A protein has these predicted regions:
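Short, solvent-exposed polar/charged micro-motifs at secondary-structure junctions
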Residues: 8-11, 64-66, 146-153
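Conserved active-site and cofactor/substrate-binding residues in soluble primary-metabolism enzymes
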Residues: 2-6, 29, 33, 60, ...
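Generic secondary-structure signature for well-ordered alpha-helical cores
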Residues: 13-17, 43, 67-74, 97, ...
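Cofactor-binding loop segments of dinucleotide-utilizing enzymes, especially the Rossmann-like FAD-
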Residues: 26, 82-84, 110, 142
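A contiguous loop/helix-start segment that scaffolds small-molecule binding in enzyme catalytic cores
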Residues: 20-21, 101-190
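Class I S-adenosyl-L-methionine
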Residues: 1-53, 159
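Class I SAM-dependent methyltransferase SAM-binding "motif I" and its flanking Rossmann-like core
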Residues: 31-102
Length: 190
């Protein structure tokens, strides 16, 4: 995560030369991917120098993790990245508070890295003020890869020391429950 601008600029340059280009972003290019950056860079160009392009959907790690868990995203949910590289921590905290007040299921991206290891603990403490300690939580790692793992915990027993940037976390809302080792956030059909 430091070469996105250059990759987009290179793709634009090649496309301007008439070369067909595929700019690949992991997961879905529009969900924490490079689609937004590409559009921003293209908008800085004079219209006559903008190559045409299309954005194709991918499968996001939140979808893969949700499928591993069962059906935790059946009702309203939000996705929040804890990385403060591009977004100030105060803004991230406001978004977490919004998720808490709205009782959203929360999908946590970029939970912690070697350099940034305190935000996840703070986030869990924030959730514990609004949610029951027994709220079910999925911790998945390397989703979609051969080393994929999933584990389900209560909110108060998340093994923070085992979580890294290859992890994704789904924290249930007040109606999320564990049924036969699957998480479900019922929509209200039954």
């Amino acid at each position: 995560m430091t070469q996105e601008k250059q990759r987009c600029a290179d793709a634009i340059s090649l496309a301007q030369q008439g070369i067909k280009v595929a700019l690949i972003s992991s997961g879905d290019a529009g969900i924490y991917g490079m689609a937004g950056l590409l559009i921003e860079l293209l908008q800085k160009l004079d219209a006559k120098f903008r190559p045409s392009f299309a954005i194709h959907p991918g499968i996001s790690s939140l979808q893969l993790a949700a499928a591993l868990a069962g059906a935790p995203l059946m009702n309203d949910f939000c996705a929040i990245s804890l990385s403060d590289k591009l977004t100030p921590w105060e803004t991230i905290k406001e978004r977490i508070n919004g998720a808490l007040v709205g009782d959203f299921v929360a999908v946590i991206f970029n939970p912690q890295s070697n350099e940034r290891n305190w935000q996840l603990k703070t986030t869990i403490e924030m959730f514990l003020k609004y949610r029951a300690k027994t709220t079910p939580v999925l911790v998945a790692r390397q989703v979609g890869r051969d080393q994929q793992k999933k584990r389900i915990f209560n909110l108060d027993s998340i093994p923070i020391h085992e979580i890294d940037m290859l992890s994704i976390i789904i924290i249930g809302n007040s109606s999320t429950k564990l049924v036969n080792n699957f998480l479900i956030s019922p929509r209200g059909y039954l």
